[in-house]
Design a protein with these regions (language model features):
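Surface-exposed coil loops of outer-membrane beta-barrel proteins
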Residues: 114-130, 150-256, 260, 398-405
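Residue-level signature of outer-membrane beta-barrel architecture
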Residues: 53, 89-90, 101, 142-144, ...
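Outer membrane beta-barrel transmembrane domains
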Residues: 260-262, 277, 281-316, 337, ...
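Short loop/turn motifs that connect adjacent beta-strands in outer-membrane beta-barrel proteins
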Residues: 35-47, 59-60, 89, 93-97, ...
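Transmembrane beta-barrel strands of outer-membrane/channel proteins
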Residues: 47, 51-57, 99-103, 172-176, ...
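Surface-exposed strand-loop-strand hairpins of Gram-negative outer-membrane beta-barrel proteins
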Residues: 57-80, 186-189, 446
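Outer-membrane beta-barrel "beta-signal"
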Residues: 136-149, 379, 449-461
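Hydrophobic, lipid-facing positions within transmembrane beta-strands of outer-membrane proteins
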Residues: 45, 79-85, 134-140, 170, ...
Length: 461
């Protein structure tokens, strides 16, 4: 039954994407378990589907000037669509393989340019809005028992096979995936399909996590998982060109490493998590100071490297940084979260977004008081900044792959407030109203403020 519903959903997605191109508790468990009961009685498979569409826009705002990478100061709107099929198959004890074909279409406002904290986490800086089919994930997972420990049942879910797993184990993942699948997994602010939409709220903005334009990479992750803590380490490919689909296969000189320690705890019988993240990226990314010096002598050739137009001329680029993520349940219906992030800000942003320092704080609420426990309310504030070298580069008529107003003589922290209300219409369908207020877009006090309004439709099967 469920496989039929998913096929129908995929068909509807293809139809919907065509339109995008033309525009430039018990009941839940019963429903989601139909496929497992009728098709997969042994629990060998996992099949899920998601569809997300975001309609977003902003009215005109004050701007003293604009550059080629500026957020448009006239009113605009944009529509994005993604659809993902999550396929998983159990292989042997503790092992499984997962494949996720995905379709993405539409675009972000101003093609996702002009904001360090871009307003729609479902969009990427891609030149064409036409729907495209691609392989998002394809990875192998092996769980290894490391000592006698309690066995825990893990329910079947997206990219997750129903299985009994030891509470103390090592998990090895190899293949294509998003590093955000494993790291910085804040319980209240991580998924732009169902939570906050802003880029700097879905992940730690100062973590320039290695990925292609759509957010995926190839590599390996190893996790030590214990009941009260976890340790993760990854090594993956980095792009050959900033924010591109092409990976650099010279892995001796171009690679990205991320490490994270996660501590789990209880406060007054309510769960919480604290995560410490560190990363290093090696690539052909040039330094801001080198580009600034060259531009003062009339050589602006490195701007094409920073803006993702061509590959770097030599290896040796190093970016490193740190992040802290915290989330704590206060009541069964209320939770708080926070993030802090910093990177050295000396070399070009190569994969995620042009943020060198970030701090965020927010809350999530299930409004039981109005007897709608399936709904969700979120409110958060995030402040983003860049290094002095990054600031000087942008003020010298430099451009990154996201930012560049032509100058930046009046620098200010980019400040974002986001609020959303998510309504559960039926067991598999949600609609969200979202508002973002953005001060100093792209760190520029001469532009803004910007009001962003969004409607999001989300399906999960």
């Amino acid at each position: 039954m469920k496989i039929v519903q998913i096929l129908i959903a995929v068909t509807l997605t293809l139809s919907f994407c065509g339109k995008v191109n033309a525009q430039g508790d018990d009941a839940d468990n019963h429903y989601k378990g139909l496929f497992a009961n009728r098709f997969d009685s042994l629990g060998q498979w996992s099949v899920h589907y998601q569809f997300t569409s975001v309609l977003q826009g902003h009215p005109a705002f004050n701007s003293k000037y604009s550059g080629k990478n500026s957020l448009r100061d006239t009113a605009e709107k944009a529509l994005s669509v993604t659809a993902t099929l999550f396929l998983g198959r159990k292989l042997w004890k503790g092992a499984a393989v997962f494949v996720n074909p995905e379709i993405a279409g539409g675009k972000g406002m101003s093609y996702a340019l002009g904001l360090a904290g871009a307003a729609n986490g479902e969009t990427f800086r891609i030149g064409s809005p036409e729907p495209a089919l691609y392989l998002a994930r394809a990875f192998f997972e092996q769980n290894i028992t490391i000592r006698k420990s309690k066995t825990l049942y893990r329910k079947e879910d997206q990219n997750q096979i129903a299985d009994n797993l030891p509470s103390s184990r090592i998990t090895i993942t190899i293949g294509k995936f998003s590093l955000a699948d494993f790291f910085d997994d804040n319980s209240y602010s991580h998924d732009p399909r169902s939570e906050f939409m802003n880029w700097s709220l879905m992940d730690n903005g100062a973590w320039d996590y290695p990925a292609n334009t759509r957010g995926y990479t190839w590599g390996a992750v190893i996790e030590l998982i214990e009941p009260s803590y976890c340790f993760r380490l990854s090594s993956v490919l980095v792009p050959k060109i900033a924010n591109s689909q092409i990976f650099d296969l010279n892995i001796a000189k171009a690679n990205g490493e991320t490490a994270e320690f996660e501590k789990k705890f209880m406060i007054n019988d309510h769960p919480g998590n604290l995560r410490f993240l560190a990363f290093t990226n090696f690539s052909s990314a040039p330094s801001y100071n080198t580009a600034i010096s060259n531009m003062r002598h009339g050589d602006s050739s490195l701007v094409a490297v920073f803006s993702g137009q061509k590959a770097g001329v030599q290896y040796g680029g190093l970016k490193y940084g740190f992040g802290i993520s915290f989330n704590q349940e206060l009541k069964s219906y209320l939770g708080v979260f926070s993030r802090l992030g910093w990177n050295d800000g000396n070399t070009a942003t190569w994969a995620f977004t042009e943020i060198d320092r970030t701090a965020s704080l927010g809350i999530r609420v299930r409004p039981n008081i109005i007897k709608r426990p399936g709904d969700n309310l979120g409110l958060a504030v995030v402040v983003n900044g860049i290094s002095n070298a990054h600031r000087t580069y942008l003020n010298s008529n430099g451009y990154g792959f996201l930012l560049g107003d032509g100058k930046l003589s009046n620098y200010g922290y980019e400040q974002i407030i986001e609020a959303f209300y998510k309504i559960k219409l039926i067991s598999w369908l949600w609609i969200t109203a979202d508002y973002q207020f953005i001060i100093n877009p792209g760190y520029n006090k001469d532009r803004g403020s910007v009001n962003v309004f969004s409607i999001r439709l989300h399906v999960e099967l």
